[in-house]
From Swiss-Prot:
Entry similarity comment: Belongs to the TBP family.
Keyword line: DNA-binding, Nucleus, Repeat, Transcription
GO annotation (BP), single: transcription by RNA polymerase II
Lineage: Eukaryota, Metazoa, Ecdysozoa, Arthropoda, Hexapoda
Pfam families reported for this sequence: TBP
Keyword flag Glycoprotein: no
Name of this protein: TATA-box-binding protein
Function, in words: General transcription factor that functions at the core of the DNA-binding multiprotein factor TFIID. Binding of TFIID to the TATA box is the initial transcriptional step of the pre-initiation complex (PIC), playing a role in the activation of eukaryotic genes transcribed by RNA polymerase II.
Annotated gene: Tbp
Keyword match Aminoacyl-tRNA synthetase: no
Any single Gene Ontology cellular-component annotation: nucleus
Organism: Spodoptera frugiperda
Annotated region (Disordered), positions in chain: 1-20
Single GO molecular function: RNA polymerase III general transcription initiation factor activity
Location in or out of the cell: Nucleus
CDD domains from the UniProt entry: TBP_eukaryotes (cd04516)
Amino acid sequence: MDQMLPSPYNIPGIDTPLHQPEEDQQILPNAMQQQHQHQQQQQQHALAAMGSSPLVGFGASLMGTPQRSVHTYAPAASYATPQQMMQPQTPQNLMSPMITSGSLAGQQMLSQASPAPMTPMTPHSADPGIVPQLQNIVSTVNLNCKLDLKKIALHARNAEYNPKRFAAVIMRIREPRTTALIFSSGKMVCTGAKSEEDSRLAARKYARIIQKLGFTAKFLDFKIQNMVGSCDVKFPIRLEGLVLTHGQFSSYEPELFPGLIYRMVKPRIVLLIFVSGKVVLTGAKVREEIYEAFDNIYPILKSFKKQ
């Protein structure tokens, strides 16, 4: 009992390693050999991809040299061409497309690149179907001579003179259909023309009539003083709501006048707005002011449209 039989199993103690140092010496050479074979395979694949590159000789010299480093570098196929033989390439996004004169795509691209042609300013409004029409133009001219109104009234056609009622000769012509107020000082006012050209033509005809009566009349300082336009917005308007919202610019007294008087600041135009949708614009010196005033007032009128 005091002597214990030897055990058939060799049980290692706490201080005994699990394998012998001889086994470590066998594992390390095997790992190095496998790593070296793996590096040679990578080099062979790289050389096969390179094909007939000028760097094949350089790769072959690498195969004969033992590799001491774990990491290897194999040049890719895209870098196989020598640097001095490469040409600078323009990036694709910076290249201009080839445009032929006969191709449809080329014509479309040219039309998009070139801006639209400039056109002269034309009257426009918030609603393209509504353009104010000129109804009356008032112009003045200086004949630069003293006039005998009684002589003019006696010898001229279509002329009337009543000094008790009005201190000017009232003369009319048919083409353009206008009326002139001729004063003894030589000043004349022409009204009733529908366009700027007609107003100037009518004033020249009146001056020619005065010349034929023996007066040394000239044609100086012709100027358009007032233009009147009108239009129809084609819908009824709530004038009560408009005067409450825009009381600073408008006045509405239906017992005195059926229209709302709207005094626009810029351009300086006075508008007469009626419940039926009719609008009268007056006070303009040029017709563009009438078009601009209507462009400004139309969205306001549309917001007060009767339902």
